[in-house]
Amino acid sequence: MKDLEEMKASNVGLKMMQEQAGIKDMPLTQNFIRQLHKTLLREDYTVYRELPGGQQTSYVIHAGRYKTRPNSVITRYGDRFEYAAPEETAALMADLVDWYNEEEAKGKLSPVELAALFHYRYIRIHPFEDGNGRIARLIVNYILARHDYPMIVVRSRGKKEYLEALHQADLEVGSTPSIGAHAELDKIRPFLRYFSALVAVEIYNDVRFLTEPDENVWWYDGQRVEFRTPNYAKILRIMQSQPSVTIDSLREQLGINKSAVQRLLSSLKEKGYIEARDNEGGWRVLITPSL
């Protein structure tokens, strides 16, 4: 149930971002960023943790409000990396939003450069106690969408590369949070290279998606999937139009025996292309056709 509510909140946040990005003469505001955060987190909640000595502690995560506690991360190299202090967060976010609006108006930075630098500066502030990554991704796509670029996704398989690009930029910028929050473009070159490549891949995939219509070509998690056995594509299309279809019905529509249908289903489930709908019965298709 919690996962379903989080998914609904994410969808609402995505729609908010897209609608706001479509209003070209509306500047970015701190209030919009906080509203996105409140939408994603939905409500305040308490986090309980055990300290090294076994002592219990707790604190409240506030939806839509900047952090009231220091936050940091342990890097993959074992170092503790500090983000901006709570008392400087509001001022740094004001600087960030003002800078963005001014730079967008000037038009000297490309949309990719603008989005990459905003993302890096935002991450160095880490203004909320939770949900910073989700907000960072939404605002990056807000910036790209305002300039008619495709949305990007940092997929789980690419997270290590993403974190390494940030780390290399951190080495050039330095560890002081306030300096990171005002970093210049030439100081974040490792992250800019990574980000530019990510956008280029999304554009390339979008072009392929639009120009390569084929019944057997589908897309999953940003990757092209070509089925060499046509029955895979056929069964997926049946599931899309008939989510509650039964195995017996699939057997009849495909003209194959029941064990063959079960092998197809098992393969599709194993790869994550479909999943059973627990409460409603039937199937949910998670892969996208190119035609």
What kind of feature is each model-predicted range?
Residues 1-130, 134-291:
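FIC/Doc superfamily catalytic core
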